[in-house]
Amino acid sequence: MFYCCYLLVSEKAASRSVYIGSTPDPARRLRQHNGEIKGGAYKTKRSRPWKVACFVHGFPTKIAALQFEWVWQHPQSTRHDDLRQHSRVVSVKRQTLLSCVRALGVMLCCEAWSRWGLRVAIFDDAVHRLWLKERLPSNCIQLCSFDDVESLRLADYGGDAGWLDTQRKKRAQLSVQAQCSICVRAILLPCFFLCCPFPDCRMIAHSTCLAASFLQEAQDDEHILPISGTCARCKRLLSWKLLVQASLSPSDEDNGAVGDTGESDDNNERESS
């Protein structure tokens, strides 16, 4: 479920090296980069020791995180028009801490990612100062200690490590002779359906019906997928991203739809010094 894109900064004297990668386990990945355990990227060996300056989390799937990572590493090669308009981002030939922070802030405002509800955990004061100086979006950042990583990981599960298992059991129970709470038609498996994640609510709906309901509520006729909406039964506010995450089966996770124990390929990662 949890998968983040991180920015490393070298703590080596006189080094200005930075490094962008992705992982489901930031603490373990940092130990790998610093040579404490096997599996660190070869490209980061010369600039050890490293620290995690910040990471972005809240991605709907692992694939989404990997796509975001690639653009963050290669902003000059992006095909996103709203990102290409920022010459200070796409004209960079050599990555620095400033260019990485600036690119991240701009990306979060782009149409491709602004509706994902991504969050930035900042662990380094220098990154925080740059963020404020560049007047980047402040509603998505959180200044915290790297010791808080586990709580951030759990936040992307809905706050409970067993949350997904609970949701899967609930879906299995509700899917038996189910009726859509919106169109009132039968939900015939294996169609894609969504359930309210709250334990005391039995709302179940076709994904298309629920998306249309949320978009109508938001008076949004420009997008296909919503950000959030009100449950048709319990009237609580629901996050579309969490609804979709709760609907993914273990096989979806195995196929890479959700973060697993693997890391991003070294060929996709980039270090600049």
From Swiss-Prot:
Gene3D superfamilies: GIY-YIG endonuclease, Zinc/RING finger domain, C3HC4 (zinc finger). One of its GO terms (molecular function) is zinc ion binding. Keywords: DNA damage, DNA recombination, DNA repair, Endonuclease, Hydrolase, Metal-binding, Nuclease, Nucleus, Zinc, Zinc-finger. Its cofactor is a divalent metal cation. GO terms for biological process: DNA-templated DNA replication; double-strand break repair via homologous recombination; maintenance of rDNA. InterPro entries: GIY-YIG_endonuc, GIY-YIG_endonuc_sf, Slx1, SLX1_C, SLX1_endonuclease, Znf_RING/FYVE/PHD. SUPFAM superfamilies: GIY-YIG endonuclease. GO terms for cellular component: rDNA protrusion; Slx1-Slx4 complex. The keyword Glycoprotein does not apply. Residues 250-273 are annotated as: Disordered. Its EC number is 3.1.-.-. A zinc finger (SLX1-type) spans 180-234. Residues 1-82 form the GIY-YIG domain. Pfam families: GIY-YIG, SLX1_C. It is found in: Nucleus. Catalytic subunit of the slx1-slx4 structure-specific endonuclease that resolves DNA secondary structures generated during DNA repair and recombination. Has endonuclease activity towards branched DNA substrates, introducing single-strand cuts in duplex DNA close to junctions with ss-DNA. Belongs to the SLX1 family. Forms a heterodimer with slx4. This is Structure-specific endonuclease subunit slx1. It comes from Schizosaccharomyces japonicus (strain yFS275 / FY16936) (Fission yeast). The gene is slx1.
